[in-house]
Design a protein with these regions (language model features):
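Large, well-folded core regions of big proteins
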Residues: 1-211
């Protein structure tokens, strides 16, 4: 995720997720955050060919929304692409990331329409694992004010079970460790207070994208 390294969309989005929090504590995080944000905005894939790529794009859009970027048009484009290409995507963690972004934009109806189904992380592959998907999706829904939705509570429970099982086994990948730590910063999973969690930029969408 560094300027001189090969660009990895998922890892870059995860780094930006952490930088958003780091900026609250240290203004020196602003420059790397701005550089990474610009790169992610330019590179987000709105026409993914696999559900794993779609999940990465959805997570990226959630993190960009959380950071303060207006993403309404991209959310609409990605949602349309997934609807036409991936049957049952509404149960994937990708739907949770889109719901979180819509909620942060105060598009509540769109957000809640995407957390009606019981989530499943079984399809997670590529850069993802089921455990990583559950941890980051639970974190996103919690931070977006959807933590009391049944889908979010299911993901929180799943993430907690994954965490206990994985650490008991003693084998933890760096990416999963980062995702699990990210989840631990949210109120429902444990970490930040509700007030601290609410300190992120609050965007309001005033005009929907055409189409």
């Amino acid at each position: 995720a560094m300027p001189w390294s090969e660009f990895d969309p998922f890892l870059s989005a995860l780094v930006l997720d952490y930088l958003v929090d780091a900026l609250r504590l240290d203004s020196s995080a602003l420059e790397p955050l701005q550089l990474l944000r610009s790169r992610l905005v330019r590179s987000v894939n709105l026409d993914p060919q696999t559900i794993d790529d779609a999940r990465t794009s959805a997570y990226t859009l959630w993190v960009l929304t959380r950071e303060g970027t207006m993403t309404t048009a991209q959310l609409e484009a990605l949602r349309a692409s997934m609807t036409s290409r991936f049957e049952g995507w509404e149960r994937d963690a990708a739907a949770s990331f889109l719901a979180a972004a819509y909620s942060r934009l105060r598009l509540r109806d769109e957000a809640r329409s995407l957390v009606k189904s019981t989530p499943s992380t079984a399809r997670a592959a590529g850069a993802w694992t089921p455990e990583t998907a559950a941890a980051l999706a639970a974190s996103a829904l919690s931070e977006a004010g959807l933590g009391q939705e049944p889908a979010a509570r299911f993901l929180v429970s799943m993430a907690g079970e994954d965490l206990a099982r994985t650490f008991a086994a003693g084998i933890v990948s760096p990416l999963y460790a980062a995702a699990a730590a990210r989840a631990a910063l949210t109120p429902e999973v444990g970490g930040l207070t509700a007030g601290e969690s609410a300190a992120s930029p609050d965007l309001v969408c005033t005009r929907r994208a055409d189409g």
